[in-house]
């Protein structure tokens, strides 16, 4: 009787209305009906070590990153009387435009280096209270395809290109995973308002 009611209650199969399981279903069928109801597909993620090998940091870039970090530390500790200025777009969606911006900013930064420590804001991820585009790393094509490996490559390549100009970069870290792919190219990392109380970040 119950099995008949279950069969009769079946409606059209949609993402919001997954198929009901028969009481006689086996473990594999039950698991398939319950697991990953909101997952459309799974793709392997490139490892941080492989991406770093594919897009390495050279000596000049490493020097820019180290100098950017040490200068920021000196300013925050009061050993350098310059101001830190983090300037750049809200979030990068066009690497070519961001690199053009970086060229222009590097010229200005060179002219004020005695008064200001200029760091380019290069944010790739968008913290979201609700829904919306989550940034270049998560959805580089802005079409919902979520080509994360492509996004990670684009992000790391852009950070290397900007640092090669002698301009240090700053990024917001929304989770402890992304820094494994790009942290060696970043001079200044931020924790945003939405993640300020994140237990994962505290750990």
UniProtKB/Swiss-Prot annotation:
InterPro entries: Aldolase_TIM, DAHP1/KDSA, DAHP_synth_1. Residues 1-28 are annotated as: Disordered. It catalyses: D-erythrose 4-phosphate + phosphoenolpyruvate + H2O = 7-phospho-2-dehydro-3-deoxy-D-arabino-heptonate + phosphate. The keyword Transferase applies. GO terms for biological process: amino acid biosynthetic process; aromatic amino acid family biosynthetic process; chorismate biosynthetic process. Residues 1-10 have a biased composition (Basic and acidic residues). Pathway: Metabolic intermediate biosynthesis; chorismate biosynthesis; chorismate from D-erythrose 4-phosphate and phosphoenolpyruvate: step 1/7. The keyword Amino-acid biosynthesis applies. GO terms for cellular component: cytoplasm. Keywords: Amino-acid biosynthesis, Aromatic amino acid biosynthesis, Transferase. It comes from the Bacteria. GO terms for molecular function: 3-deoxy-7-phosphoheptulonate synthase activity. Its EC number is 2.5.1.54. SUPFAM superfamilies: Aldolase. It is an enzyme of class 2 (transferase). Pfam families: DAHP_synth_1 (PF00793). Belongs to the class-I DAHP synthase family. Stereospecific condensation of phosphoenolpyruvate (PEP) and D-erythrose-4-phosphate (E4P) giving rise to 3-deoxy-D-arabino-heptulosonate-7-phosphate (DAHP). NCBIfam families: aroFGH. PANTHER family: PHOSPHO-2-DEHYDRO-3-DEOXYHEPTONATE ALDOLASE DAHP SYNTHETASE, PHOSPHO-2-DEHYDRO-3-DEOXYHEPTONATE ALDOLASE, TYROSINE-INHIBITED. This is Phospho-2-dehydro-3-deoxyheptonate aldolase. The gene is aroA.
């Amino acid at each position: 009787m119950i099995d008949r009611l279950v069969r009769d209650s079946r409606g059209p199969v949609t993402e919001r209305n997954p198929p009901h399981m028969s009481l006689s279903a086996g473990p594999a069928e039950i698991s398939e009906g319950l697991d990953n109801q909101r997952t459309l597909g799974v793709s392997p993620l490139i490892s941080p070590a492989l991406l770093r090998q594919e897009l390495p940091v050279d000596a000049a870039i490493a020097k820019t990153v180290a100098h950017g970090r040490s200068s920021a530390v000196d300013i925050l500790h009061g050993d350098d009387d310059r101001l830190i200025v983090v300037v750049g777009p809200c979030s990068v969606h066009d690497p070519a435009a961001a690199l053009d911006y970086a060229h222009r900013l590097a010229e200005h930064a060179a002219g004020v280096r005695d008064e200001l420590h200029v760091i380019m804001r290069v944010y790739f991820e968008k913290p979201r209270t609700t829904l919306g585009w989550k940034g270049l790393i998560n959805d580089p094509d802005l079409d919902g395809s979520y080509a994360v490996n492509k996004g990670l490559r684009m992000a790391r390549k852009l950070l290397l290109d900007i640092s090669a100009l002698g301009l240090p970069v700053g990024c917001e870290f929304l989770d402890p995973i992304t820094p494994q792919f790009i942290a060696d190219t970043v001079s200044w990392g931020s924790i945003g308002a939405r993640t300020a109380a994140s237990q994962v970040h505290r750990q």
